[in-house]
Amino acid sequence: MIRTMFKSKIHRATVTHANLHYVGSVTVDKDLLDAADILPGELVAIVDVTNGSRLETYTIEGQAGSGVIGINGAAAHLVNIGDTVILISYAQMTTAEAREYLPSIVHVDAANKIVQLGTDPAEALTEGLNRPPFSTTA
């Protein structure tokens, strides 16, 4: 059996640009893509923490060190400059692979600079956020 599993995420990034008049996608700082093991053109889910919107799109590599998280095209109707977002990628793997796989978690600050890398999807670094109740990963 092949399962679709959580592969990586850029956690609580700040949207720096929103361009409605673009063909689509999300532009992401190359350093963040590399740290999260996300390739240009890869499918990502974007969860807007600010307003609850969820969408799927593909990534475009942005300038390294720029901190860019740019929402392009129709998604700019759902996600605004200044919103806090989580970019999530998934991968298909066998059950055996899934049981052994460790995801790449990239925690960023308000300027989208990396503050910590990890593998625990339930880890909460932001003040006021807690681990989900009864989560067993540590």
Swiss-Prot record:
- Please share the entry's free-text remark on the cofactor: Binds 1 pyruvoyl group covalently per subunit.
> Which reaction equation describes what this protein catalyses?
L-aspartate + H(+) = beta-alanine + CO2
Q: How is it modified after translation?
A: Is synthesized initially as an inactive proenzyme, which is activated by self-cleavage at a specific serine bond to produce a beta-subunit with a hydroxyl group at its C-terminus and an alpha-subunit with a pyruvoyl group at its N-terminus.
Q: Which cofactor does it need?
A: pyruvate
Domain of life, per UniProt, equals Bacteria
What pathway does the annotation place this protein in? Cofactor biosynthesis; (R)-pantothenate biosynthesis; beta-alanine from L-aspartate: step 1/1
Q: Which GO terms describe its biological process?
A: alanine biosynthetic process; pantothenate biosynthetic process
- Gene3D superfamilies of this UniProt entry? 2.40.40.20
Name the predominant localization.
Answer: cytoplasm
Localization, per the record, is: Cytoplasm
A molecular function (GO) held by this record is: aspartate 1-decarboxylase activity
Q: Please give the GO cellular component terms listed in this UniProt entry.
A: cytosol
User: Which SUPFAM superfamilies does the annotation name?
Assistant: ADC-like (SSF50692)
Tell me which residues bear Pyruvic acid (Ser): 25
The EC designation for this entry is 4.1.1.11
Q: Where is the active site?
A: 25, 58
Q: Where does substrate bind?
A: 57, 73-75
User: What does this protein's UniProt record list under function?
Assistant: Catalyzes the pyruvoyl-dependent decarboxylation of aspartate to produce beta-alanine.
Quaternary structure annotation from Swiss-Prot or TrEMBL: Heterooctamer of four alpha and four beta subunits.
Q: Which NCBIfam families match?
A: panD (TIGR00223)
Q: Into which family does the record put it? A: Belongs to the PanD family.
The name under which this protein is listed is Aspartate 1-decarboxylase
Q: Which organism is it from?
A: Renibacterium salmoninarum (strain ATCC 33209 / DSM 20767 / JCM 11484 / NBRC 15589 / NCIMB 2235)
Taxonomic lineage from the root: Bacteria, Bacillati, Actinomycetota, Actinomycetes, Micrococcales
Q: Which gene encodes it?
A: panD
